[in-house]
Amino acid sequence: MKPVRWAADAVVTMREGARVRLDYSAQSLWRVDRMIDEIRREGTPYAAVERELRGFGAYAGEVIVRQTGAEWWASGGEYWIRTPEGRLWDPIEEARRCFGGHGSLRLLCRDATDAVRR
């Protein structure tokens, strides 16, 4: 599935380009949020980082999948995570929100994980 590939590409990009290791842990999302914040502060145009943001969102989705047993859902070219209690989450859109200064992949993962535990 595409999001799994996008997530793997983000891991490689972060390791090779930024020398940051991502291990699919919830804690690693702090590094991803910080990287997105740095890119935004540099004034990079959205179009120049759209693919990277998609990869970061897919990576966050994979973290949620691995933490909660969720699965990827696709419809019309859009991808979401469906957690076991039936809730849908959009980590790719959350990465875009992070770039706009209004989101957090780390907090999205925390909320999704907490929702499953309730």
Question: Each PLM stretch: what is its role?
Answer:
Residues W6, W30, W72-W73, W80, ...:
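A residue-identity detector for tryptophan
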